[in-house]
């Protein structure tokens, strides 16, 4: 059994989780046969990590997030295969939609002024190669975003977060790895989770 991965990234409140659910429905119920027998969604950080941090009363670090992803992959029964690794003529059995992955880890670490430990850099690079591609949902009007995890109106700055994502995407262009990241502009006045998911599904057909 093999698996393929795609990631959904973007600022808090842009709608990643809702879009992931819609995308799963589209891929499983499209008229033409989907190449995947199963489509699954995995949210990061995992509930286990979030609960442990809450019980310990501590904030999660970039290293915590990376270990969380690495541990999840380690306990999966399917082998992890890089998208650019030649394989036999066997179609992937399962598609995993990753709700957040390494891009968010790097973005939020930068916003916290946190340096990713040198020992974690190889893990960051390895995990970054797992998804076939990463769809980055970018809000057209970031100032309208809200996050239920930040009840204090001063606790979440969506414009600063969006700017951080834009900087990382710009760096991806410079480093010639932009093909790994596909920006999707989200216009809250016109777009719906379904229409965004449909756009992603169409982009996936071309991959």
Where are these regions (language model features)?
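ATP-binding Walker
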Residues: 14
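Walker A/P-loop
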Residues: 17
